[in-house]
C-alpha cells in the first residue's frame, strides 16, 4: 500500500503532463476588430457605402465590433497521415453599449484528413462547414470567389503541372419553393437548397514568379419532391474564374477575370441565388398616383463580367502600398442589374518598426441598369497607427483616424415598407428610395484590429 501511495503523486504528475501537452496542442486562431467613433454632424460614427456597390473602403469606415474565434486541433497523426478538426464561431454587434447580446454564427465545423489516400499523396479530403479557399480584396472586404458553407471535397491533388481541387457546398434561400397545400393551390412554402459544384486547378506556372489558377463553379436550386420554384425563377448558373498571381516587390499582384451566368450573378462569388420569391407592392407618388410593382422573384437571368486587379507591395524600407481597381457589369434580362467600378489606394509610411501613417483614398461609381443614372462617392481616411511589425499586414494594430466622404446619388432602391426592393428609381422621381442624395460627412475615432 505504501508503494502504491508513493507512486500516486508520480502518476498524477504524469497524467497532468499528458493533459497539459494535449491542451497545448489546441490551435487558437481568429480575427477581431472594435473601436469607437463620432460623426462630425453629431452622434455615433456613420459608415459610408455607395448605394448599389457590394462593398466599401474599410479603413476608418467600420462601425461594428466583429470577431471570429477559431479552435482547432490535430486529433490523430501516424507518419504523414493526419486528421485535423477545425471550428469557427463569429460574432457581430453595433458597438453601442457595454452589454450587447447577439446570437453567434457557427461558421466552421469540419474535419480535414491529409495523405489518407495512398495513390494521391499530398491531397486532403474534408467534410463539414468550412471557409473554402476564399479569395478576397482586404482593403474593401470584398470576397470575389467564396463558396463557403457546409460541404465536402478533396483538394491539392498533385497532377505534376498543378494542383486539382474538387468540392461541393450548399447555401439555402428562405421561401424559395412552393407545394400544393389546399385546394390545389401552391401555398406551402419551403426553403430551397442551392448546391454548388466547384473545380479548381491551381499552381500553373506561367512566368518567373507567376502562377495561374483556373476555376469553374456550377450552382443550381435543388428542390424537394412535390415542390416547385416560382415561375421565372433562376434555377441554375455558371461562374468561370481565371486568376494570375505575380510575386513582386516583397508582395503580390493579382489579376482576375470572372464571368457568371443566371443564378450565379447576384452575389458573383460562386454561390447560387434566384429561387427566392418576393411579394408585390404599391408605391404612391406625392401627386397621389399609384404605381404597382408586380410580384417578382429574384430572377437573375443574364450575365456578369468582372475584371479585377489588386495587390500589396513594399516600396523600399519606409513605404508599403495596397491597391485595387475593379470593373463589374451585371446585365439582367429584367433590367435590374448594375454597372460598378471602383479604384483605391492605401499607402503606408513607416516612422518606426511599430508606428506608421496610413492614407486611404477610394472612389466608387455605380450605374443602375433600370434608370441609367449613376451614384458615386469619394472617401478619404488618414490614420495614425501602432502595429506589431513593419509590414502593411502587421497585426495587432491600434489606430486613430479621420474620414471624409462625399457622395452624389442619382438613384436608389425603392422602399417596400420597412424593406428595400430590387426595383430602382431616380432620386428626383418622387418615389421613396434609399438614395442618400448629394451630401458629405466626416467621422473620427479609434479602432483596434487583430488576426492571429
Curated annotation (Swiss-Prot):
GO terms for cellular component: cell outer membrane; pore complex. Residues 1-25 form the signal peptide. GO terms for molecular function: maltodextrin transmembrane transporter activity; maltose transporting porin activity. The record marks 31, 66, 99, 252, 393, 451 as: Greasy slide, important in sugar transport. InterPro entries: G_neg_Bact_CarbUptk_Porin (IPR050286), Maltoporin (IPR023738), Porin_LamB (IPR003192), Porin_LamB_sf (IPR036998). It is found in: Cell outer membrane. NCBIfam families: PRK09360.1 (NF006860). This is Maltoporin. It comes from Salmonella paratyphi A (strain AKU_12601). The lineage of its organism: Bacteria, Pseudomonadati, Pseudomonadota, Gammaproteobacteria, Enterobacterales.
